[in-house]
A protein has these predicted regions:
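Major-groove DNA-contacting interfaces characterized by cationic-aromatic clusters
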Residues: 8-11, 15, 55, 195-235
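N-terminal core-binding DNA-recognition domain of tyrosine site-specific recombinases/integrases
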Residues: 21-96, 226-231, 244-249
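Short, charged hinge/linker segments at domain and secondary-structure junctions
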Residues: 56-59, 89-112, 172, 297-300
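Basic, Lys/Arg- and aromatic-enriched nucleic-acid-binding interface segment
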Residues: 78, 93, 97-99, 103-157, ...
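Catalytic-site neighborhood detector that most strongly recognizes the C-terminal catalytic loop/helix
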Residues: 111, 175, 205, 272-298
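Short, basic (Lys/Arg/His-rich) helix/loop patches that form interaction surfaces
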Residues: 130, 134, 147, 198, ...
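A short, basic/aromatic helix-end/turn motif that makes direct DNA contacts
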Residues: 156-162, 269-275, 285
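C-terminal secondary-structure termini that scaffold catalytic or DNA-interacting sites
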Residues: 166, 177-179, 185-195, 202-204, ...
Length: 313
């Protein structure tokens, strides 16, 4: 039975919007989380799921929606399905429905091909570095290439985040979007593990030292206007005359060069701010596989020289 007429007519999205607004007003979630959740809810706005009251939704309706989502990425499907399940949980709590038809329901798998990680080859990277000095985002490009930082983290850097004495960068903020999709500097990173201190390498050190000399007490890039990742992406496409290029490639390029140099996955995980090493391994599985044979030869030679053929103890 329903509690009242209003709830009896509640749709999936109306329940979800009210729930997110309530959590945000109670300071239970950050604005960046609120914005991401709202984006997931919007994928439920089109079609029968947003027309009928949730109490009238049947498994057939869910099946139709599920099928319609197959051309989206697994990430989009997963986020939308999480919101869908949440709506039915809310409806159960409010006694709007008496049975949760999604209790054991499985979401659709995406029919889209999984995009492999894109990174510059060494030749492409050299060409890009030769190209960027003329760009207004030169420093952002160089920082991303030399550290693997997300572009949102780069654009949120403050003078105080650069420690020239210790040669480190303190990553503790990012650029997020509010409920109106306007960019702002978020006082926390994308994830808990995104907050990290990374080394300022010898290539980047002299460049950034010169750049920040007149930036004391200021944000390095986002002072009068916050610079969003999409702005830098657009400029990168124009600069390279390649619509397939984006700034996340710079992060992947850094990670790829690290793997090529022999850096262990557990170290790379910390540098990139991944929460779980499986994220690092799964994201760069092809790159790790490429160098597996080389690593096997290194292990083989080590065994020969140190363990089985009279090597030093």
């Amino acid at each position: 039975k329903t509690l009242n007429t209003l709830e009896n007519n509640a749709t999936i999205t109306s329940l979800l919007y009210l729930n997110e607004k309530d959590k945000f007003n109670k300071n239970l979630i950050q604005i960046s989380t609120y914005t991401r959740n709202i984006y997931g809810i919007k994928k439920l706005e089109n079609g029968v799921l947003n027309v009928l009251p949730i109490s009238e939704i049947t498994l057939q309706h869910i099946d139709e929606w599920n099928y319609s989502m197959k051309n989206f990425s697994d990430s989009v499907i997963s986020k939308s399905f999480i919101q869908l399940k949440r709506a039915f949980d809310i409806a159960m709590d409010k006694q709007i429905i008496t049975r949760n038809i999604l209790k054991n329901y499985k979401r659709a798998k995406s029919s889209k091909k999984t995009k492999k990680v894109s990174a510059f080859t060494i030749t492409e990277q050299k060409k890009f570095i030769e190209l960027i000095p003329k760009s207004k985002y030169y420093m952002q490009y160089m920082i991303a290439l030399c550290t693997g930082m997300r572009m949102g983290e780069v654009n949120a850097l403050h003078y105080n985040d650069i420690n020239l004495k210790e040669k480190t960068i303190n990553i503790n903020k990012t650029i997020s979007r509010d409920s109106n999709f306007k960019s702002f500097i978020n006082s926390t990173t994308k994830t808990k593990n995104g907050t990290r201190v990374i080394p300022l390498n010898a290539i980047l050190y002299p460049i950034i030292k010169d750049f920040i000399s007149d930036k004391k007490g200021k944000y390095l890039f986002s002072n009068d206007n916050v610079i969003s990742t999409s702005q830098v992406n657009s400029e990168m496409k124009r600069l390279t005359n390649n619509l397939n290029y984006n700034t996340h490639m710079l992060r992947h390029t850094y990670a790829t060069r690290c793997i090529e140099a022999g850096i262990q996955a557990v170290v790379l995980k910390k540098l990139l701010g991944h929460g779980d090493i499986s994220t690092t391994l799964n994201t760069y599985v092809d790159v790790f596989d490429k160098y597996e044979k080389q690593n096997n030869i290194i292990i083989e030679n080590y065994f020969k020289n140190n363990l089985f053929l009279g090597g030093d103890n």
